[in-house]
Amino acid sequence: MNMIDPFGRTISYLRVSVTDRCDFRCTYCMAEDMAFLPKKDLLSLEELDRLCSVFIEKGVRRLRLTGGEPLVRKNIMHLVRQLSRHLDSGALEELTLTTNGSQLSRFAAELADCGVKRINVSLDTLDADKFHQITRWGHLDKVMQGIDAAQAAGLKVKLNAVALKDFNDAELPDMMRWAHGRGMDLTVIETMPMGEIDADRTDQYLPLSLLRASLERQFTLTDIPFKTGGPARYVHVAETGGKLGFITPMTHNFCESCNRVRLTCTGTLYMCLGQEDAADLRAPLRASEGNELVADAIDEAIGRKPKGHDFIIDRRTSRPSVSRHMSVTGG
């Protein structure tokens, strides 16, 4: 069974935000004094497993756990181990997660044991002081130890860096060399107008077309058709032998090939990262021990999936395109 939206796109990728909490407070993702969801509003790990399983029955082939920081959710490995049965059965092709890396020293080996093959680590700078500045609470050495642990466990690591003008743009070439030297791909992401937007956010916006032009003065970049199921467009870097990805929601949106939906830890389904329209799956999930009601709610929601997002960086307004913080939906 496949889920097909009104524009003929097959929905095969589910991103699940298992918590809105995080041990960092990255400036583009969260307010420093974030008010978190009360625990009673959260789906239990068992409910998350049940919901994910319904999506898998309906054709989801790739499942990514996100946050917040997914590895700070209490007993998260119980959910990972439960979901891994779908890898064993062949129903799910891939189970992966996006993490800030702070908890990887603790969990990397168990993730690998559960059948996770690759992970994404969000890392915007290799400068310890700048790292603390952008994450507010984070420590770079802990993340580096986590990356070491992940690679030692056999996990393939890809780095995600948000490109921020006058913050990390000058060091992105060195980050790429470092990542490729360790066998990791790097993907750079345009900052998106979500949550609280101040002057810094619009001033830090860097179109990746400019970054690519700058990189092409130093490196030989060749477009390649490589895909991981996400929106990144990849180039091969001749000088390093590695892959560099660009995620460009602002300057070259990727909506025409969108294959994903996003589920939050409260059971809210967002059909698009850049739209406010959502569907409540918690109520139908809890209304019956069977899955018919929630399956019908999913079908109805997929039927409302929009053609594209509404992101725009507008210096004339401080109003974000989307009012919720990235940490709520899972970046």
UniProtKB/Swiss-Prot annotation:
This is GTP 3',8-cyclase. Pathway: Cofactor biosynthesis; molybdopterin biosynthesis. The keyword Iron applies. Coiled coil: none annotated. It holds the Pfam family Radical_SAM. One of its GO terms (molecular function) is cyclic pyranopterin monophosphate synthase activity. S-adenosyl-L-methionine binds at Y28, G68, S122, M192. Its cofactor is [4Fe-4S] cluster. PROSITE patterns: MOAA_NIFB_PQQE (PS01305), RADICAL_SAM (PS51918). Its EC number is 4.1.99.22. GO terms for biological process: Mo-molybdopterin cofactor biosynthetic process. It catalyses: GTP + AH2 + S-adenosyl-L-methionine = (8S)-3',8-cyclo-7,8-dihydroguanosine 5'-triphosphate + 5'-deoxyadenosine + L-methionine + A + H(+). GTP binds at R15, R64, T98, K158, R260, V261, R262. SUPFAM superfamilies: Radical SAM enzymes (SSF102114). The lineage of its organism: Bacteria, Pseudomonadati, Pseudomonadota, Alphaproteobacteria, Hyphomicrobiales. Residues 6-231 form the Radical SAM core domain. SMART domains: Elp3. CDD domains: Radical_SAM (cd01335), Twitch_MoaA (cd21117).
